[in-house]
């Protein structure tokens, strides 16, 4: 279905163009800029929702709302956009989290024009990379995303912000080199005219050796973003230093771009190599769940502890992608959406409680529950969501990944039992570090000894942000078909490539 009205182009370009108008707004304090940004974000979210409700057919696994504009003539480079069941979930998640992150960024007063412009530019890059149907365009959007994050880190971070920003840019730019090599290698192979169109590429077959080389290149690029150990070390530093609204975007969306690329490029375009590499992916995912869950209790810094819990949750996504079953891949997509909400909410709460008590190390905190009862309540609920309490979205996602790995015909019985056992140990270790974090922060008497200790509890703004993240978590936990019905046809189409041989 070719659409004559360029919905997706408007959705991708609106935030960055509207954001560049911020610099022309009158100097009337930060309030104008803040409200302008929030309005742009909400308008974008409404526009996206409208487009998906009225112009998107759920039961069609093909790409919809496609747009094709010639961009560079002699290189056959098109501005190609289109969405299918795989990208619609992350795009809506992006809109939701970015709107709430701009709402959460109210304490930022220094250089607030640049800050809000960077938030909007990041928004464009994220939606562009989720909806692009051209590999080079995907790469450009992937890179466009990188610069705002670096600046947000280096200008509004904590004490060691320059170190962590440099580490971040080195890791991700190093990964992007491999991504560029892979994109050019795929585009230039096997035909006189280079093509970068995802549709034509997904029907093309490559020699297995070349496919493996390309696969490794893409895998390195994506495992920096979706941190797969041993390439995860930028994540705790970056999260420990960034301002919490940046953290929400990092945990909620940036990590999901890696998972999306893994499914979109490695699984769709390179099926043979993926079936060779998937046992290794599963092993790495299981190791990662255990490793991050064991490293997390040793972190004194609150944000670093939450960052390691993110790394641990990403292990489930890797296992779901590696299991090559409908169930496993659906579980991975559900975990992508669910962790997008949970991770963002936890970082938001960590940041707001830091705004209240100005302590970042867990062993200095204690007794916060008496002064800040609302923060305590919401933090506890979200920790339960993160440790996969039944009725929350995390539980269902991990359960579906479990079923996916058990029902997989790819592997023998013994390895499957072993991997399931390791995953179960990881799920047991998760409550240990999360509950000890709650205990160190909220229980005890430490903050009693602070002179004139009167702390403001949650205001209406913080309550609004945290509850609007909490509602989708519970909704997905009770009725996961919200998310699964979007992607289930597309997932079947991807998996059917694997069993035609």
Curated annotation (Swiss-Prot):
This is NAD(P)H-quinone oxidoreductase chain 4, chloroplastic. It is an enzyme of class 7 (translocase). It is a multi-pass membrane protein. Keywords: Chloroplast, Membrane, NAD, NADP, Plastid, Plastoquinone, Quinone, Thylakoid, Translocase, Transmembrane, Transmembrane helix. The chain crosses the membrane at residues 5-25, 38-58, 85-105, 112-130, 135-155, 168-188, 209-229, 243-263, 275-295, 306-326, 331-351, 387-407, 417-437, 463-483. Belongs to the complex I subunit 4 family. InterPro entries: NADH_Q_OxRdtase_chain4, NADH_Q_OxRdtase_chainM/4, NADH_UbQ_OxRdtase, ND/Mrp_TM. It catalyses: a plastoquinone + NADH + (n+1) H(+)(in) = a plastoquinol + NAD(+) + n H(+)(out); a plastoquinone + NADPH + (n+1) H(+)(in) = a plastoquinol + NADP(+) + n H(+)(out). GO terms for biological process: ATP synthesis coupled electron transport; electron transport coupled proton transport. One of its GO terms (molecular function) is NADH dehydrogenase (ubiquinone) activity.
């Amino acid at each position: 279905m070719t659409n004559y009205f360029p919905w997706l182009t408007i959705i991708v370009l609106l935030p960055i163009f509207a954001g560049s108008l911020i610099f022309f707004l009158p100097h009337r304090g930060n309030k104008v800029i803040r409200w302008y940004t929030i309005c742009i974000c909400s308008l974008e979210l409404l526009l996206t929702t409208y487009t998906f409700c009225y112009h998107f057919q759920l039961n069609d696994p093909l790409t919809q709302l496609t747009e094709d504009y010639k961009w560079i003539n002699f290189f056959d480079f098109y501005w190609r956009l289109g969405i299918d069941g795989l990208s619609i979930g992350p795009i809506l998640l992006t809109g939701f989290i970015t709107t709430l992150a701009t709402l959460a960024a109210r304490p930022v007063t220094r250089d607030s024009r640049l800050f809000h412009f960077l938030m909007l530019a990041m928004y464009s890059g994220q939606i562009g990379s989720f909806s692009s149907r051209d590999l080079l365009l995907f790469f450009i959007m992937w890179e466009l995303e990188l610069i705002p994050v670096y600046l947000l880190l280096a200008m509004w971070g904590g004490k060691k912000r320059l170190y962590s920003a440099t580490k971040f840019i080195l890791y991700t730019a190093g990964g992007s080199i491999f991504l560029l090599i892979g994109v050019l290698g795929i585009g230039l192979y096997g035909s006189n005219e280079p093509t970068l169109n995802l549709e034509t590429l997904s029907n093309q077959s490559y020699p297995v050796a070349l496919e493996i080389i390309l696969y490794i290149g893409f895998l390195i690029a994506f495992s920096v973003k979706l941190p797969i150990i041993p390439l995860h070390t930028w994540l705790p530093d970056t999260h420990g230093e960034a301002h919490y609204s940046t953290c929400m975007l990092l945990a909620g969306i940036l990590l999901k771009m890696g998972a999306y690329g893994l499914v979109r490029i490695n699984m769709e375009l390179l099926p043979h190599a993926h079936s060779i590499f998937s046992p290794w992916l599963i092993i790495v995912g299981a190791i990662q769940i255990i490793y991050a869950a064991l490293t997390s209790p040793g972190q004194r810094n609150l944000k670093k502890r939450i960052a390691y819990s993110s790394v641990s949750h990403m292990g489930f996504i890797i296992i779901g992608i590696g299991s090559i079953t409908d169930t496993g891949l659906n579980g991975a997509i559900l975990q992508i959406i669910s962790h997008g909400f949970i991770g963002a909410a936890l970082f938001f709460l960590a940041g707001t409680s830091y705004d209240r008590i100005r302590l970042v190390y867990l062993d200095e905190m204690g007794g916060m529950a008496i002064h800040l009862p609302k923060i305590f309540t919401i933090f506890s609920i979200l920790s339960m969501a993160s440790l996969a309490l039944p009725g929350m979205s995390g539980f269902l996602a991990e359960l579906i990944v479990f079923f996916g790995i058990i029902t997989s015909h790819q592997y023998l019985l013994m390895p499957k039992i072993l991997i399931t056992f390791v995953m179960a140990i990881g799920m047991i270790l998760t409550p240990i570090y999360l509950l000890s974090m709650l205990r160190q922060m909220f229980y005890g008497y430490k903050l009693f000894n602070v002179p004139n200790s009167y702390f403001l509890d949650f205001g209406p703004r913080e309550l609004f942000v945290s509850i609007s993240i909490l509602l989708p978590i519970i909704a997905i936990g009770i009725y996961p078909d919200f998310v699964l019905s979007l992607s289930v046809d597309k997932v079947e189409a991807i998996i059917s490539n694997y069993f035609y041989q």
